[in-house]
């Protein structure tokens, strides 16, 4: 099967102004090359002949080079980065006009990525336009790296392209139910700051710009600890850090069928970035799993476990702003042994919303009501969007939910 794109990546590209760009065509061209990279990587994993493996490796590398040098990829990256700035009102970032975006394209299309020096991102220099350029070039590399890693990531990893946090919550709902045998949850937060960088780079194989990725990994501590979470959408660091957790399902002997349905009877796993929840049938199984991860998995990758909690699901636990707990089906009848699983916004996430709203009210007391509404609406809409698929009606009905407005 031919996985090469017959047309050059930059064919028929003529841009006079930003508003004249045919975005469906740009997305189509980038997606086509990404699909070819994914297909070639899948074939590489299934191939057993060493000669054919080398040929497929060259195909993957050539396709990635084509995509990295594609101006369509650069256009899409500029649109993605600048658009995320505009819609994230919680971070004060300079707005970009169409002329600014076009000028960015004219400057970056001549940049040699091999000679680019990665920058450190923090909340103090986020308004710097050089940081914006760095994020755009990161996204150019990420678009070429994503399909290769998509072919390798396990079904339990949800922090990747095309997945959302609500998908991880939905997976938890399917794994932990009233009729399920796994009634204990092992919560683990990995500390990835001291991860073995050689292990990550070896996972990338023949990626064309390993030296640039290595430079980003050297600066991982500054980028990983930043509170400006919007960079996770376009930054290379989170997806590179996910690489060191590949093999977690193999370590736990978790096996999946053709439709990504778990067929093994042992622990079950849900992973989001550096956090994971392992569901076990007993407390002893959870303790054994934790010791196994510490002794083999973490030691080989040179990573540490920040926190590890073992809780019973009937007591409930928090995961990324949500509370997961098994409740009695009938509160009035203590003899009724039936259970139901409810997922609600956690008290901490509700408190966080109230603190953000309170800070805005205190900061803009002298401003008009319309100005204040423009500031608080994005926050309310954002949390309402993330809570819409869970049991959240009680959070809106509370008069004083974990913190009150002035």
Tell where the protein language model's regions lie, with residue ranges.
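Amphipathic alpha-helical segments in well-ordered regions
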Residues: 139-144, 148, 243-251, 379, ...
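Short coil/turn segments at secondary-structure boundaries
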Residues: 41, 48-60, 72-81, 89, ...
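Conserved polymerase palm-domain catalytic core
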Residues: 107, 116, 120, 167-296, ...
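Active-site and adjacent loop segments of nucleotide-processing enzymes
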Residues: 2, 10, 33, 283, ...
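Non-catalytic, polymerase-adjacent accessory regions of viral genome-replication enzymes
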Residues: 1-110
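Glycine- and acidic
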Residues: 15-16, 124-128, 153-157, 185-187, ...
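Short, conserved non-catalytic motifs in the polymerase core
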Residues: 82-94, 114-138, 151-164, 186-187, ...
């Amino acid at each position: 099967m031919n996985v090469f794109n017959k047309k050059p990546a930059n064919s028929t590209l003529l841009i006079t102004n930003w508003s004249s760009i045919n975005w469906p065509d740009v997305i189509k061209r980038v997606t086509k090359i990404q699909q070819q990279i994914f297909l070639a990587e899948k074939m590489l994993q299934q191939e057993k002949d060493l000669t054919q493996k080398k040929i497929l490796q060259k195909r993957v590398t050539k396709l990635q080079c084509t995509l990295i040098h594609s101006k369509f990829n650069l256009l899409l990256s500029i649109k993605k980065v600048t658009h995320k700035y505009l819609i994230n009102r919680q971070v004060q970032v300079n707005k970009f006009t169409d002329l600014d975006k076009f000028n960015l394209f004219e400057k970056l299309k001549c940049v040699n990525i091999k000679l680019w020096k990665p920058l450190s991102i923090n909340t103090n220099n986020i308004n710097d336009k050089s940081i914006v350029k760095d994020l755009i070039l990161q996204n150019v590399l990420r678009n070429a790296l994503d399909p290769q890693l998509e072919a390798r990531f396990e079904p339990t990893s949800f922090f990747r392209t095309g997945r959302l946090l609500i998908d991880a919550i939905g997976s938890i709902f399917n794994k932990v139910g009233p009729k399920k045998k796994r009634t204990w949850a092992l919560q683990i937060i990995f500390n990835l700051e001291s991860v073995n960088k050689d292990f990550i780079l070896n996972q990338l194989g023949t990626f064309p710009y390993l030296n640039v990725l290595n430079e980003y990994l050297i600066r991982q501590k500054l980028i990983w600890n930043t509170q400006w979470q919007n960079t996770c959408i376009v930054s290379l660091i989170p997806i590179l850090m996910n690489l060191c957790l590949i093999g977690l399902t193999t370590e736990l002997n978790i096996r999946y069928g053709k439709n990504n349905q778990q067929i093994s009877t042992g622990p079950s796993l849900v992973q989001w970035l550096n956090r994971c929840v392992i569901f076990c049938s007993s407390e002893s199984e959870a303790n054994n799993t934790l010791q196994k991860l510490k002794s083999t998995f973490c030691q080989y990758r040179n990573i540490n476990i920040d926190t590890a909690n073992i809780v019973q699901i009937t007591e409930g636990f928090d995961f990324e702003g949500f509370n997961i707990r098994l409740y009695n089906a009938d509160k009035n009848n203590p003899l009724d042994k039936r259970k139901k699983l409810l997922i609600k916004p956690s008290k901490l996430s509700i408190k966080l919303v109230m603190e953000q709203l309170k800070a805005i009210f205190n900061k803009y007391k002298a401003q008009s009501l319309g100005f204040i509404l423009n500031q608080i609406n994005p926050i309310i809409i954002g949390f309402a969007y993330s809570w819409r698929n869970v049991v959240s009606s009680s959070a809106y009905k509370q008069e004083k939910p974990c913190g009150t407005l002035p």
